[in-house]
């Protein structure tokens, strides 16, 4: 993609709802977990393509707070896949200069997964080529709820005066306090809904809902979506002169 250093139209922060693994597997006559494994492979390709495409921040929706409602077999399989992915990708992520951080409520996750998450955050903290954020056991409403509880506790403890609370206060308590707001949110699989993903942060994001199932979402398709984004005019609530 062409780049004008003084006026780069490309999205700095892209967030992706990776949907369609199960339907992709069903179309192949395979179990749902097979689709999740193929989806994990696709993550690597998209991560590797980001620096060349000018994406500085990539946030991916890996597991929502509602996904616990799936069958125990699928949930257990997904947890095993997360552990395998975190273990096998550590070296490649480091070699490619990727900094990894996680958002979501860690309390319900297995200690082994939490340990790997913590390790990956520490090992990659000095990397700067790409900032990869993985939303794991994440829900937008849950995030705001947890943030509000922490804010209320600070008020109760006398650390924060109610009169000092404004629109800029809550983001400091969100999981994403270290991230800029997303410029573009992509959802694969043809579903046109946000599923609680980055509800507060995406107020002025552009959305792209595409029919492609996640395991079929190639870097070429990713680049095409980014090119479409570059043609849009973001007004942030203002009127075009």
For the regions a protein language model found, what residue spans apply to each?
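Flexible, compositionally biased loop and terminal segments
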Residues: 1-241
């Amino acid at each position: 993609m062409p780049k004008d250093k003084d006026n780069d139209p490309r999205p700095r922060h892209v967030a992706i709802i990776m949907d369609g693994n199960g339907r992709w597997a069903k179309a192949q006559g395979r179990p749902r977990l097979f689709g999740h494994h193929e989806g994990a492979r696709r993550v690597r390709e998209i991560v590797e393509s980001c620096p060349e495409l000018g994406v500085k921040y990539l946030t991916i929706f890996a597991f929502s707070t509602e996904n616990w409602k799936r069958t125990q077999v699928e949930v257990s399989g997904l947890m095993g896949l997360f552990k395998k992915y975190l273990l096998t990708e550590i070296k490649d992520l480091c070699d490619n200069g990727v900094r990894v951080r996680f958002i979501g409520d860690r309390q319900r996750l297995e200690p082994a997964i939490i340990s790997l998450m913590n390790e990956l955050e520490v090992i990659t903290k000095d990397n700067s080529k790409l900032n990869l954020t993985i939303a794991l056991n994440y829900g937008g409403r849950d995030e705001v709820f947890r943030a509000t509880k922490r804010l209320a506790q600070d008020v109760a403890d006398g650390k924060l005066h109610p009169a000092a609370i404004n629109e800029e206060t809550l983001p400091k308590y969100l999981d994403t306090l270290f991230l800029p707001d997303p410029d573009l949110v992509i959802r694969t699989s043809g579903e046109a809904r946000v599923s609680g993903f980055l509800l507060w942060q995406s107020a002025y994001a552009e959305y792209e809902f595409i029919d492609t199932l996640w395991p079929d979402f190639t870097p070429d398709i990713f680049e095409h979506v980014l090119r479409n984004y570059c043609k849009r005019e973001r007004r942030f609530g203002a009127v075009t002169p």
